[in-house]
Amino acid sequence: MESKNVCAVQNNQKNSRLSRRKTVIAPLAGNVKRIYNRHENVYTLPPKRERRKYPMTISDIAKLAGVSSAAVSRYLNGGPLSEQKRAVIQAVVEKTGYSPDTAAQTLRTGKVRQVGVIVPSISSQSVGQIISGIASELGASRYLMLLANTELDEQMELEYLTALQRNHVAGIILLGYDSSPQLCKALKDCRVPVVVTGQRFADLPCVYNDDRSAARDLTRKMLEHGRRNIVYIGGSEQDAATGIARRQGVQDALRETGLNADALPRAYCTAFSMEEGHRCMEELLARCPQLDGVVCVTDTVAFGALQVLRTAGRRVGEDVGLAGIGDNWAGKVVEPGLTTIRFYQRQVGQEAARMLLQSLEHSGTDAAPVRQTTLGYTLVERGSL
């Protein structure tokens, strides 16, 4: 019995060796190598390898669009190009999802297609409108926007000016809210083109609103409604535009009517907020209980003043007139609607971006003349006067 088992094992081992010897290998075309799988006793073909995918180049885009590589380069860099070619290239870029290597572009051209934008408060409606205008113009010229929010911190404003230059931005747009000597010097010392909005600096490109005329026309309208005991809630006079110019505009209108403009009762906000409007209105009511008109430096401040007047039993639009500046969306829905000044802030942003792009085009050549642009406004009369 034991000898039979031994014979069976020997026969199995022999058959196994014979099986391995008789494995048939089919001939393969070319130089394709077989892989022997010793566990399955078979030869297999190697797995197919996916071809390496290389990123698309300008040349690839040019071939797909049927244009020259130079035309694609001009498209990507915002250069001159016919509308027909621009449309064809844009369609190919969008279809392929092509994105140029910005680092390679910088090495090749020596230009960084990034612009720093410094803002005082990202939560402000007017700031948002200006940013929208800037972004539309920069995007059309293939520039990226780097946003820096100072939260009304003067030191942070100066630090961002330095940091953006260290990051090699092509230029800077500053949404100004003060005009301190330190800021003025820092702007003039910038190594890249700078454009300022909202403030006026000598020898720098600026885009600003006519704050003085706007405040004057707003106060004139209030005077037309028979208001004579007018008070003013203003902003910090470190700000030459909203602080000084708007207060001067109110005084101009009073002076034209023969009133004592220098004696204008006023209180100053530390921030353009409803809370500060509330505080200043309480202060002025205590000092001038006979007041019949209130002009506010911004609409948001006016909303805070409105709360106090209602609590005091003053009927806005009847017992007392109220007006703000800025055309905040909420002014349309409060009751009564708030009379205000509408500035065209998106256009401010667009014009600032155009100025900067023009400066970048002239970099390295004869400098373009410094442009300073004042934009208009509209007086929006509602029921609050």
Regions found by a protein language model. Give the residues of each.
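Bacterial carbohydrate/catabolite-sensing allosteric modules
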Residues: E2-M56, K95, S136-S141, D189-V196, ...
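N-terminal helix-turn-helix DNA-binding module of bacterial transcription factors
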Residues: R17-R20, V24-R113
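Short acidic/polar active-site loop segments enriched in Thr and Asp
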Residues: S68, R113, A170, R228-N229, ...
